[in-house]
């Protein structure tokens, strides 16, 4: 009995010893694990634990404003409400949780705890259709209040779900095998599906959110507005050419004021945005100015909004709150920088109204007929106009018709022909025609190839052996096959050659310069590269691309070698009158005339006024045009407008009446007309997607000149006007340019006292002596 008791005691001691060893082993294991957690991996797990105690909310930033030269707002962010749907609604979790709560409530807590898992799921399945129907009703109400189709709402939610699932898959691929993933933040937050709802809608949606928690949320946002997206401009019709003149004024609605310049923003974040500047960098750090699909955003998609995206874009703020201590850490958002332009919005709107065919000048009119083939009277013509301040290079107006918004009022055939939305002032290129003549002269004198006082005879045709090639416009049967030298009784000075637009003079000048001399001079004038106006952003020339501004067309080295190899002398001489392989934009034309007015000083046109926002490689220096050449060129341009024989002096109507083109009191205009051969006009007439209609033999109409008050000693503004397929430069582009000059007067850029005196002025019929039988200015100035 004693032995049995001793044995039992021994076994008990052994069991206690074993348990002690096991306990000590467990303590040792736990100690090692505790050491690992607190010492070896302590910092990592502390950071992880603290991160779960933190909540982070992003604060929206404000995009910088775009302002005109007077400080008028052209684009700005204003407060707005966005509508967000919780991800639990999007992936179906909300309906399942709603059904589960209903099922538990129907069984009661006690019974719910005793039934099997399968039984619970069965009850939930019975309640799920009711919850889904309830949720569908909520979404129907959201769509109704937001005035969007339910299908659009469903499409937005599907897009969100697809994006979040891609993020989850990416996280799963990066995780350790077998490790259970926690929900990512996108699965626990709301996602914007409708932007910019009114206050009343936001209020109603908040009531809906209170009734159905966890479904819809109204969040603070911003929307981009363009206060000058449209304007109504009142124009004086008493200043129009006689056949269009009528008493009083007309109000022209101008949609899309500056839309091709300012541009637009988009809400969608594209892959290229995230690639260029991700919100979360590869090292896990956050760029508060970066892009993320999960955060509402506004991104420049065209125009200056896109070109100056980084300038205008701000940085979001952040609010972090610790759940354990309620400590709040706040990083304030940084707004984007404002961008000030050189353009005057009121002048711009007025010029765009002048270009609108409703005003009458850019519709084909009976007195404009000329050339080989004409368009029907009343045909709408695309057009562009540019105004540059000579002293600064500031672009005051950069107008084009039709704008994108103008396209809504055009027929399908007109949209095909007129291509609304193209910024013809800066992006479209055209053969310059005769408007280059003063520039070619100045280049020849600057290069030492011509004396400033050179006189050249006009023989009607440049090549003695070919009387039907390289002709002057006056050497035609309708003018009696005469010459300018016959009319002036001798060789022509540059003043006479410019005012009469003699082709032979400038054929001769181009021949003296040679192919490379002419091409190099065109490049000096700004062709072959964009001007760095800011329309393409602050990037240097090698990164600017093609959008926003065209570099123009001029022969490159390979082209010149081909021309030289085949001894093509004809191309050289026609380059002297702006024909052949050369084309430029109205912006480049106005810029070149401003350069001539400054005597060659390079101060290229700019649309952005902030120097820090302009490209770093804008041109400097001077083309060093001799003062005598500049003086003579400007005098020739003055005579072209003021002398009765000048190509920019008058328009002749069908009844024989001739009326001065420019009649602005107190203002001096010096300019050059151009009638440039145009490529065939083609368009889709029946809307089948094929451009089957074509008209050949048409011309583009140019007028480019310099403007000042009569009392000024120097030109103040350079003006360029282009009317596509407008025919005669004097008859079509000239009257448009006259109205642009009137706009400068009305907006106070020319003498204010004369602006007041000119209000309400009308015109009387003006007849001019033909001067000994001298022919009218040409319908066409190009060689054939």
Located regions from the model:
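Intrinsically disordered, low-complexity mixed-charge segments
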Residues: 751-768
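Short helix-capping/linker segments at secondary-structure and domain boundaries
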Residues: 267-274, 450, 598-603, 749
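Membrane-proximal periplasmic segments of bacterial cell-envelope enzymes
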Residues: 1-332, 356-384, 390, 403, ...
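Surface-exposed helix-capping loop/turn segments at secondary-structure junctions
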Residues: 361-370, 647-651, 748-752
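Ordered, soluble secondary-structure elements with a strong preference for glycine-centered loop motifs
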Residues: 298, 727-731
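Solvent-exposed, polar/charged alpha-helical surfaces in well-ordered, non-transmembrane soluble domains
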Residues: 72, 81, 136-140, 144, ...
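Beta-lactam-recognizing serine transpeptidase/beta-lactamase-like catalytic domain environment
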Residues: 315-336, 343-347, 369-434, 439-723, ...
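Short amphipathic alpha-helical signal-transduction/dimerization elements
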Residues: 597, 641, 738-749
